[in-house]
Amino acid sequence: MFRLFISTTARFCQARGLAPALSFAIDCTRAAPWALRWTSFIDRFCQDRFGTAAPLNLIRAGLSRPGGIGRGRRISRLRAHYDVIGAYFAATAATRMVFERAVPMAVVAGEGGCVYQLEVLTPEAHMRDEGELMLALSHAGGTVAALPFRFGYCGGNRLALRLGRMHVAAEAELVETDLYGLPVRSVLMDGVYALARTLGMTEISTELDDNNAFWSDCGATYIPGGRFSLPLEAQFWHSEAGRTALGEAWVPQQMARAEIMSQANAAVGSWLRYDEAAHGRARRPVSVAAVK
């Protein structure tokens, strides 16, 4: 443990300078034993899964306390999140998720010819208290909408998806017009449903926020603790009311949405880690941290 602390501090000093290294050392001292527990876990995880040391920013993430939660709960959440990535995702997708590289999910062209990408990214700094990854809809000009999330467990080894708050840019209405009226929030949720469906999630939940009306449209129900539980399949788009509300825009919009969903489902399926001994089924977690 002490040797790992020394070597990690040296890595900070070499890569970022003396001040960040001292800051890391001080935070580790203040947060012990949580800091050593987290550093040991994530370093072992990266060595076993990728054959390399954990990235410094990821080590640092375990020492923060976003949202005011305790360090123990923060580390439990992180361990569950990376446990799912390590157990379920193939090397290419897992490497991109851990080492902050984009994981493409779907590409769709708007009516005006603009190309939009749905992908999994590392959250921007101001979203790090809401999730360890984020679904993002973007084009050449930047991100239009983003949804932070993290993987977790509920009731033992059942998989769960914990969503953060929807972040939507001011230009969203223009993008929705170009996408035949398809709401950008719904595009992000198609990514959520692709993850939930392919991974066999048993729960999707989110905190109460300023998107409560949208969560209600998705069929969410309130659960104790200030959270919404979402259905595992889209509700609005399967209803006759949804079709009537859209009118003539229904057909081109649904064609665009069907293309996004098809690509997203195929993409997530290609990310999974399969075990031949399990006859093609995705691997189950090696270790389970049951946290909410």
Please state what every model-predicted region is:
Residues M1-L159, M166-V175, A194-K292:
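Terminal substrate-recognition subdomain of acyl/acetyltransferases
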Residues E176-A194:
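Conserved acetyl-CoA-binding loop-helix of GNAT-fold acetyltransferases
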